[in-house]
């Protein structure tokens, strides 16, 4: 099992905390965000971790090498003009190595805090594409937002499969959980993921975004539509997202 952390972001809403550090190195309750992710992944038995940086790449690179001996470091030089999917594909070489070595691959956002227990549940899923879903999302969202519906996204599950995610909801009935930014590709499925990416129309719009700025949820939705759903790895809290300075006051 390998993992790739997408850590190219600037984190403008966390300024001035991100003036001298990338977003993933902001401190939360005594540790940097990326510390929690690496410790959770390693604690669940992930054998190899790669990181894609962007903003203040050399700061992140130095920290990864000195604190965690992580050498698989990739750079999204266009981090300020692209989004998550492009950041992930900056590590295409790493994705292809998972295919060659028959290693499943966990993809993690870099601004979330989660436990090894959540990673273990994801590892245990046997689906080609598995997505962690928080069924108790409203507990966290009500701490973060005056109106949770405004920031939440749709997520629909049927018979253990995620069929839709990432759209703007009209009501709470359209939200059966929240995507937290943590998912897994099986090594059998990764070639199809790369083929699907290569087949996408570079001139098209994806949920209102151009190809280079496509949301990860739009990409995952495309895979779901093409290949028939994704396994829902259901959790009940136990994680948090750090997007605003106020999030730093919330306990996971």
Residue ranges and their predicted role:
Residues 1-5, 31-104:
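Conserved N-terminal catalytic core of the sugar/cofactor nucleotidyltransferase
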Residues 1-19:
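N-terminal nucleotide-binding beta1-loop-alpha1 segment
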């Amino acid at each position: 099992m390998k993992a790739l952390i997408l850590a190219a972001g600037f984190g403008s809403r966390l300024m001035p905390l991100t003036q001298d550090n990338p977003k993933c190195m902001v401190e939360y309750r005594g540790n940097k965000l990326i510390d929690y992710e690496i410790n959770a992944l390693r604690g669940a038995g992930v054998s190899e971790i790669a990181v894609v940086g962007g903003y203040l790449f050399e700061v992140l690179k130095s920290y990864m090498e000195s604190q965690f001996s992580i050498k698989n470091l990739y750079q999204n030089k266009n981090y300020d003009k692209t989004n998550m999917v492009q950041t992930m594909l900056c590590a295409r070489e790493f994705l292809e190595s998972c295919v060659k070595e028959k290693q499943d691959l966990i993809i993690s956002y870099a601004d979330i805090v989660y436990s090894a227990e959540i990673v273990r549940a994801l590892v245990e899923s046997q689906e080609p594409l598995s997505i962690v879903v928080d069924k108790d999302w409203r507990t966290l969202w009500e701490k973060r937002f005056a109106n949770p519906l405004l920031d939440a996204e749709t997520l629909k599950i049927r018979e253990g499969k995620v069929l839709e995610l990432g759209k703007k909801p009209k009501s709470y009935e359209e939200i059966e959980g929240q995507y937290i930014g943590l998912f897994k590709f099986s090594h059998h499925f990764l070639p199809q993921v790369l083929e699907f990416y290569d087949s996408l129309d570079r001139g098209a719009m994806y949920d209102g975004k151009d190809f280079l700025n496509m949301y990860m949820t739009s990409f995952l939705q495309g895979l779901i539509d093409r290949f028939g759903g994704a396994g829902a790895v259901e959790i009940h809290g136990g994680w948090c997202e750090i997007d605003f300075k106020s999030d730093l006051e919330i306990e996971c």
